[in-house]
Amino acid sequence: MARLHSGKRGSSGSTRPLRTEVPEWVSMSAEDIEAKIVEMAKDGKQSAIIGNILRDMYGVPNVKLITGKSVSSIMKEAGFYAEVPEDLFNLMKKAINLRNHLENNPRDTHSTVGLKLIESKIRRLVKYYRGTKVLPAKWRYSPETARLLVE
């Protein structure tokens, strides 16, 4: 798939092996995995980071294959999932950091263009999440609300 804001071609990536049964070398049970996810969610970690930690430190190749639920759905059941989706939250964090940089360096035109691209991607995501009822219909992005949400 191509890059979003450039004319470059994308790079091909490997696909996850198609597996329907749990590998025999996985030592953790579904209950242990769910408990570990809830424990890490209490510490404030996001679902993508939790998945990476489970893969790298605990040898869990696929949470959904073992538990039957995704990491984010386990976090939602436990009440630790944020009201703003993670991808949108991370983009808002990136935009805030770039705004702080531009306050100190107002002549950095490359970063100004980058901020416009990030904020346009945020607006597209907000439009999608409003359509899928993840965000309320009147939710709007503004740098002030993003700053309040992130901090």
Curated annotation (Swiss-Prot):
InterPro entries: Ribosomal_uS15, Ribosomal_uS15_arc_euk, Ribosomal_uS15_N, uS15_NS1_RNA-bd_sf
Region of interest (Disordered), residue spans: 1-20
SMART domains noted in UniProt: Ribosomal_S13_N (SM01386), Ribosomal_S15 (SM01387)
BP GO annotations: translation
Keywords, sorted A to Z: Ribonucleoprotein, Ribosomal protein
Entry-linked CDD domains: Ribosomal_S15p_S13e (cd00353)
GO CC term (a single one): cytosolic small ribosomal subunit
Single GO molecular function: structural constituent of ribosome
UniProt KW Transit peptide keyword: no
Lineage top rank: taxon: Archaea
Entry similarity comment: Belongs to the universal ribosomal protein uS15 family.
Summary of subunit composition and partner proteins: Part of the 30S ribosomal subunit.
Protein name: Small ribosomal subunit protein uS15
Origin species: Methanococcus maripaludis (strain DSM 14266 / JCM 13030 / NBRC 101832 / S2 / LL)
